């Protein structure tokens, strides 16, 4: 447990202090529908849009389908597919596919603090060119007494065999249930790139809507 807490704060510190060459402000939006299909198994369909260049141009649009199964109260696993449209600087569109598998672990640190770890193995690319990436995300949630607000922090690294860790994300988020089956989350994220031409630091505002069918 202590190792996990130290890892969260270490990665958060590293991602906030990393040096990069270019900056951009982006906004990300997503809407997801969740449906229980059988016992302990949910289907999630998610669509998202991302804007770049100070949120003035399209960067990415995607549709994601995921099946997640609960193994026990702490461990879950999932498989998913994402179809992605990407716009380059000249606004030319290219398509990518992503296939991924997740393993989740969650537990409580105390009565009001809980943590979660997500390990993701993904392969993404074009028809003949795919790249394998390991992503590990650490999240810490706090249950505020007598309120429905749900604050959280998270940090995630991206690792490839060729480059090692080539991307770090740090996120602060605040969730709120708008209705019984409708949740909203607003987040601020900083993303750093490494070992690429013209590495960027992205400052991101993200809005999410999730509805349970």
What are these regions (language model features)?
Residues 1-25, 213:
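Bacterial Sec-dependent N-terminal signal peptides
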Residues 21-78, 87:
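Start-of-domain marker
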Residues 25-27, 59-61, 95-99, 130-134, ...:
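Residues that define the transmembrane beta-barrel architecture of outer-membrane proteins
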Residues 31, 63-65, 101-103, 136-138, ...:
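Membrane-embedded beta-strands of outer-membrane beta-barrel proteins
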Residues 37-39, 71-73, 105-109, 138-146, ...:
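Outer-membrane beta-barrel proteins
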Residues 39-45, 73-79, 110-115, 146-151, ...:
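Repeated loop/turn-to-beta-strand initiation elements of outer-membrane beta-barrel proteins
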Residues 47-53, 81-87, 107, 121-125, ...:
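Transmembrane beta-strands of outer-membrane beta-barrel pores
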Residues 68, 103, 176, 201-213:
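Outer-membrane beta-barrel "beta-signal"
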């Amino acid at each position: 447990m202590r190792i996990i807490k130290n890892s969260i704060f270490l990665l958060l510190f590293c991602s906030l202090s990393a040096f990069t060459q270019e900056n951009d402000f982006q906004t990300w939006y997503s809407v997801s529908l969740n449906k229980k299909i059988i016992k302990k198994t949910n289907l999630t369909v998610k669509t998202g849009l991302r804007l770049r260049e100070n949120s003035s141009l399209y960067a990415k649009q995607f549709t994601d389908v995921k099946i997640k199964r609960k193994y026990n109260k702490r461990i879950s696993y999932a498989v998913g597919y994402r179809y992605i449209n990407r716009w380059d600087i000249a606004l030319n569109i290219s398509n990518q596919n992503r296939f991924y598998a997740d393993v989740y672990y969650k537990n409580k640190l105390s009565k009001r603090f809980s943590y979660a770890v997500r390990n993701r193995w993904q392969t993404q690319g074009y028809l003949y060119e795919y790249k394998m990436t390991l992503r590990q995300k650490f999240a810490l949630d706090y249950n505020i007494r007598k309120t429905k607000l749900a604050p959280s922090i998270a940090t995630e690294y991206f690792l490839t065999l060729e480059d090692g860790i080539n991307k770090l994300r740090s996120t602060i988020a605040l969730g709120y249930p708008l209705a019984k089956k409708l949740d909203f989350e607003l987040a601020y994220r900083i993303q750093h790139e490494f070992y690429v031409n013209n590495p960027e630091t992205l400052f991101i505002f993200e809005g999410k809507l999730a509805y349970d069918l």
